[in-house]
Amino acid sequence: DVNPHRIRKSIGAERTFNDDVSDPEIMKNKLSDLAEGVHRYMSKTENFGRTVTLKLKSPDFKILTRSRSFASEIRNLDELIRIVHDLLDQHLEEAPVVRLLGVTLSNLEKENEADGGIQLELEFP
């Protein structure tokens, strides 16, 4: 059964290229576009995440994913783009040519849940 009201665990976007890409600037431009789409959806739904994941698929279909987690939610588009670009720079040698790029934000918290919820008080006699 499909549950349309399930709690979302991540927000992501990916793009498969018609031709393999080896130019890091083209990769970064596409990652910026993907991050912008993720950020737009994240802002619209008020779901903010603490883990950013970069996905790279090589021409031989090997998939490389690299993540970075933070103590607080990523809310700023420029920060999200910087993190994704940093992940690419750190792992470009592992996948210098790609046919697919992806950006995912996980460890989501709704805006009104970001403060950790309500602290319950226990009464002691």
Regions found by a protein language model. Give the residues of each.
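DNA-contacting surface of Y-family translesion DNA polymerases
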Residues: D1-V98, L108-E113, G117-Q119, F124
